[in-house]
Amino acid sequence: IGGALGASPSAGLAQDAGVHSKEDVGKAFPAKPPYSPYAGRRYPERPYFGDEHVHTAWSVDAGGTGTTLGPEEATRFARGEELMATSGQPVKLGQPLDWVAITDHSDMMGMITEIKGGNPEMMADPTLKRWRDMFNGGPVEAKKAVMELVAAQSNRKLPPAATDPKFAKSVWAKNTTIAEKYNEPGRFSAFIGYEWTA
């Protein structure tokens, strides 16, 4: 029996010990579909959640109808901070946003808070003073003031104090400063923005 088996166990394997080509290996191990369907993808795959259209007390429509929170408060709210709403109640998002764009109206941005607050330079104009009284006279009067103001703006009949370029520049500087203050690359994006009033 030993003679029948005669050769050492490694003798049969020695014949297969030669060098194999890539083709031989390819036949022995055929190509498989990619293990990871994501390999080689070059497009973004993580959604970022934010708000691209936020009006604050600086816009005529929001500020004129009761909103008291400005761009800084709106940005802090988007970042997940708790604050007091216009209604006097505490508010906080269930999950912070990844980004926000505060987009108050371009025309008269920030002017409404100055009118409502009785800015002395603006109160020298009788129309702006009357609007201030209407804004502070309750929701019905405030809505009428907003409609008058929008009509005057649409017809290019706003008082000169309401279109002062120096004031507009100062408001825009505040707006950009707020966005830059809260922008944290990699954590939260605060975009500098506005809505073009047409």
Language-model-derived ranges and their functions:
Residues 14-198:
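Extended, charged catalytic domains and RNA/DNA-binding interfaces, predominantly
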Residues 6-14:
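Boundary at the C-terminal end of the N-terminal hydrophobic targeting segment
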Residues 1-2:
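Sec-dependent N-terminal signal peptides
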